[in-house]
Amino acid sequence: MFCFKRLLSLCLLAVSAQTLVDAQAVPQTIHLQSRVAPVPATLRRRALNPVTVPLADFFLGTDLQWFGNISVGTPPQTVSVVFDTGSSTLEFASTLCGAACDNQVKFDSTKSSTFVDVGTTSSITFSTGVGVDPVVGANYRLTLRSARDTVSVGGLTANNTSLFLITNQTAKFGIDPFSGIQGMSARAQGFFASLINQGLPSLFSLFLTPQAVGHAEMTVGGIDTTKFNGSLTFASLPAGSSSTWVLNSPQLFVNGKSTSVLKASRNIIFDSGTSNILFPTATANAMYALISPDIVPHTAEPGTYGIACDLIDTLPAVIDIAFTSQSGAPFNLTIPSSELNVGPFADNPAICQTLINAFDGLSLVGGSVLKHYYSVWDVGNQRMGFAAI
Ligand SMILES: *[C@@H]1O[C@H](CO)[C@@H](O)[C@H](O)[C@H]1NC(C)=O
Ligand SMILES: *[C@@H]1O[C@H](CO)[C@@H](O)[C@H](O)[C@H]1NC(C)=O
Ligand SMILES: *[C@@H]1O[C@H](CO)[C@@H](O)[C@H](O)[C@H]1NC(C)=O
Ligand SMILES: *[C@@H]1O[C@H](CO)[C@@H](O)[C@H](O)[C@H]1NC(C)=O
Ligand SMILES: *[C@@H]1O[C@H](CO)[C@@H](O)[C@H](O)[C@H]1NC(C)=O
Ligand SMILES: *[C@@H]1O[C@H](CO)[C@@H](O)[C@H](O)[C@H]1NC(C)=O
């Protein structure tokens, strides 16, 4: 699955005749418990220290996505990417892309002495039934060419990293203030896998603040303990969750109440690239029933709901998502009422879209939860940690 945030609420699921998987380089295997026998000190790899990179907020009336700089090539060219826990590969606009990518900074592979053209072409099409700007047909489609080059993040360098150059894209991508996407899935790949092999601890942390607060950041290989008070609560990924960041939740609460529909156990995906939250239709309806009868589906854009903008800001809409910590203790991640309003619909600006989208088949949360916590994404221990901020 390739899933990230577009505009106000899309979770993009890749469907493609010629899928990215076909073109993808074989992921590097990371041996997480590799050091069993003692190794002579002289052979011990030198640990890499964690690095922190600042993130900017793609804000369109609401916080959408957070992106930062990496460098690619020799000499290095700066490429801005969304660090997306909902996907796993690196792709960015290149000079092979013509006018379609003119709003993005383009990487010029001819200026990099370390660039290797692998030359496999593929395309990836994104589809979902929901969104303020709904996906229709193939209106979110990237054309890609596989390659390898040096990639650096915060000064840590990974040679010969698999990546994809965007050679064409549909117009919907034109508004992005960044050039690409760096997947940060629960199985380390690309630059992150290389850095782990070089001795970097196999975790990263996100501090995704609202635009008004600023100073958002990602720490690769560590935890920035200056960004929260109190302690981190860790929960384990379910066995077999593969590369998806997912936690089991036994129950949802809205405004302190629960119902039989909300008491169901479900696995919830954590996608830093998506800002709205997605639940199956019956769950979304049960949640809205505890907020206001005036919130109704916005039929022009399937999966979305809305209410008159002048009613929305006074509605209590506290969502508690229950989880179980590694020690067996229950804890909640809480979305405050202030997240309910994600802004006016384009086709009717008097109606404001509400946070929860109906999406049958999965449950997914993103930025609207993550910006209220410091989050730790522990690949090596297959767990996630949260501390309130
Ligand atoms: C990314 O680098 C550009 C300069 O190339 C700089 O203007 C911008 O502020 C940087 N963005 C972040 C989030 O650090
Ligand atoms: C990466 O490549 C550079 C230049 O070829 C080399 O100096 C460096 O040692 C390489 N780094 C690693 C970790 O292999
Ligand atoms: C770069 O990676 C490719 C694919 O993994 C490998 O075949 C090639 O030998 C590597 N090149 C160098 C210089 O390490
Ligand atoms: C890029 O894609 C658009 C469709 O989105 C298509 O019309 C156009 O011909 C493509 N350009 C190239 C150079 O392939
Ligand atoms: C931690 O608590 C202190 C004292 O209340 C406060 O001044 C500080 O801003 C807090 N730091 C964070 C990162 O929340
Ligand atoms: C989670 O939230 C619900 C609803 O507000 C509350 O009843 C429950 O006590 C909370 N659980 C924890 C562990 O705080």
Task: Kindly label every feature range from the protein language model.
Residues D22-R35, N168, V318-I389:
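Aspartic protease catalytic domain
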Residues V82, F92-L96, C101-Q104, G174-P177, ...:
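Short, solvent-exposed loop/turn and secondary-structure capping segments
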Residues F2-S80, D108-S109, V118-S127, Y140, ...:
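Disordered propeptide/prodomain
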Residues I70-V72, V79-D84, L90-F92, I181-Q182, ...:
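Short hydrophobic beta-strand that contains or immediately precedes a catalytic carboxylate
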Residues G222, R266-L315:
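Extracytoplasmic, non-cytosolic globular domains
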Residues L96-I124, I196, S236-P238, N285-P302:
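Cytochrome P450 catalytic domain signature, combining two hallmark sequence patches
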Residues Q24-G61, T150-K263, P344-I356:
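Aspartyl protease catalytic domain
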Residues L60-T161:
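Signature of the N-terminal lobe/flap region of pepsin-like aspartyl proteases
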